[in-house]
Amino acid sequence: MAEQKAKVVHGPGPRGMGGPRPKVENSGRLLKRIMAEVFQHYLPHCILVLICIVVSALANVQASLFLQTLIDDYIIPMTQQQDPSFAPLAGALMRVGCIYVVGILAAWLNARIMVNVTQGTLRNLRVQLFTHMESLPIRYFDTHPHGDIMSVYTNDVDTLRQMLSQSIPQLVSSAITIVSVFASMCMLSWQLTIVTMLMVALMMFCSKKITQQSGKFFIAQQRDLGKVNGYIEEMMEGQKVVKVFTHEQKTLEGFRELNDKLKDSAKQANSFANIIMPVTAQLGNISYAICALAGAAMAVSGVGSVTLGTVMAFLALNKSFNMPISQVSMQANSIIMALAGAERIFKMMDEPSEADEGYVTLVNAKYDKDDTLVETSERTGIWAWKHPHHDGTTTYHKLEGDITFTDVDFGYLPDKTVLHDINLYGRPGQKIAFVGSTGAGKTTITNLINRFYDIQDGKIRYDGINIQKIRKSDLRRSLGIVLQDTHLFTGTVMENIRYGRLDASDEECIAAARLANADGFIKRLPDGYNTMLTGDGANLSQGQRQLLAIARAAVADPPVLILDEATSSIDTRTEALVQRGMDGLMYGRTSFVIAHRLSTVRNADCIVVLEQGRIIERGNHDELIAKKGKYYQLYTGNLAEN
């Protein structure tokens, strides 16, 4: 674990991912950005969906208008005939039936296309999120709970699914329906239209008030859901610690507290959301009843040439008009919840990527006939720094593994320095060991070598090149790292070793395992190198996981090694086994080693003793023992413990 990391300061959102709530003025910006994602890849599909929506809406309106013709031109005249002919009525019904079929087909096609558009858009968003996540600096992951980041991929992205597949198409359909129905109602009776619009205004007023209340609770619901996911992820990772200290009840209480908050916010959000439809439906029924009474009175008195057919057609249109108003109110809550999720999605996507202004790259090299270093596409075992110059020329400098710190200061926070005036060097092939108490700055130094963090002052040079001029991906490719917390991936043992170099052959992976002395236990596994590992290698012991991590570093064959307490979790017998392999791995390579067991660094060329971010001693083992300073105290204390 890196010492003295920046204090995590969480915002009002879900443990650091939240931030300010989506404001009303941001809703348009968020919606525009979401739709831009859709149109970028699915504009033709969206145009076809719009056509289907228009056809479906017009079919419904035409079917409602047919009621006037049906009653005034067919049913009433037929009631006045002694021997009516049903053939004209049957023909009319066939025509309206065709209209209904066209509307149904358009609605079906619309739904099918929107499923494709929605799932494709969500897939693209997840890919963009993952791609951007990989470009984020380590600092981001150190200050944001992993469970909350996962919540962005799952819950927040899923809120967009309902909005894209249902809410947006429904809103467009409702808008087209409202316009077409309104025009049709005006043609039938402007007086009844005024009555309808007065009730619609009341419906919209009530919906707006309810939506304003439910919106803030939907945002809180997404925030609380992120907290619950973050807590679950944290407890799953720390389940062994929970059981060791028998804190099951305590963690359950913590979960219940977060879960109750989620329940409360979800209950409040859905309580308001669920009353929108009943309220608007009842207001719609009132509007229907008023129009029926007014229409009947007008038909009886002959006002405005209103007929019985006109009243029936208008009442059908009234239903068609009120329904989209109610649907708009319902979909508004879905959109608000989706925008709350979108705020978190785009907040993560807008996080600045890891800055990298490096231009020096790492390439395979060989010596030509003139003994000049040149670039090659073949893997020769020789690496070179490719250094382009302003005049267009390029020079190649053989990678030696010479790393130098000069007057380096660093702090995780700008106003708090944790490393002070660090001066050290690692010559090619040397083994440099860092020792010191917890929080002294050992791991922080190794984080600076691979540029997980950048220094505030001073210089770090790699083969004489300022590492800020080296492209980060190439810098890290030249480093083999065994982290304190071993992480393995789901897959076979062979695949986990090959992760160090993806183009490594099976033979090279096996050779690396032998070098790390991991070959013996691997062969005893049920399927040997093809044994599947699950759950971060949970079916292996801690020592076995660390041996695989060492083999993974070995197959990369890097010129520089960083071993962050690589053997601190291995038992003494396994440590002796590993040490022989590690000595062979480190031979000829610059190696930076951190270990709590000082016996593992006794043969280091240089031992650097750190205390509170400063180098207080340096030298080899014998020199530091003779000084009887801090190293002597640590070493003798270590021996006493053994």
Q: Residue spans of the language-model regions?
A:
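Transmembrane helices of ABC transporter permease
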Residues: 41, 45-58, 166-220, 293-306
